[in-house]
């Protein structure tokens, strides 16, 4: 071993999209994605879509 544990090389996935915002405002960012196998937290999800004008 060279001090590298494959299990620690987590693969992050995007979180879910945030809810749509009211009155045409952008929704908030989605929640962070789940962590990989002992890897870093996932990237934040995409912002929610715009609500109705």
Swiss-Prot record:
Post-translational modification, as annotated: Contains mostly 4-hydroxyproline. Proline residues at the third position of the tripeptide repeating unit (G-X-Y) are hydroxylated in some or all of the chains.
Modified residue Allysine is at which positions? 7
| Main subcellular location of this protein, as a coarse class | secreted
Task: Tell me the segments the record calls region Disordered.
Answer: 1-53
Q: Sites of the modification 4-hydroxyproline? A: 26, 29, 32, 41, 44, 47
Subcellular location(s) of the protein: Secreted, Extracellular space, Extracellular matrix
**What tissues has this protein been observed in?**
Forms the fibrils of tendon, ligaments and bones. In bones the fibrils are mineralized with calcium hydroxyapatite.
Point to the regions of Low complexity compositional bias.
10-23, 34-53
Q: Which GO terms describe its cellular component?
A: collagen trimer; extracellular region
Which positions carry Phosphoserine? 8
State the superkingdom. Eukaryota
Q: Which UniProt keywords apply?
A: Collagen, Extracellular matrix, Hydroxylation, Phosphoprotein, Repeat, Secreted
Q: Which family does it belong to?
A: Belongs to the fibrillar collagen family.
Q: How does it assemble?
A: Trimers of one alpha 2(I) and two alpha 1(I) chains. Interacts with MRC2. Interacts with TRAM2. Interacts with MFAP4 in a Ca (2+)-dependent manner.
According to its UniProt entry, the function of this protein is described as:
Type I collagen is a member of group I collagen (fibrillar forming collagen).
Protein name per the record: Collagen alpha-1(I) chain
Q: What organism, scientifically named, is this protein from?
A: Oryctolagus cuniculus (Rabbit)
Q: What is the lineage of its organism?
A: Eukaryota, Metazoa, Chordata, Craniata, Vertebrata
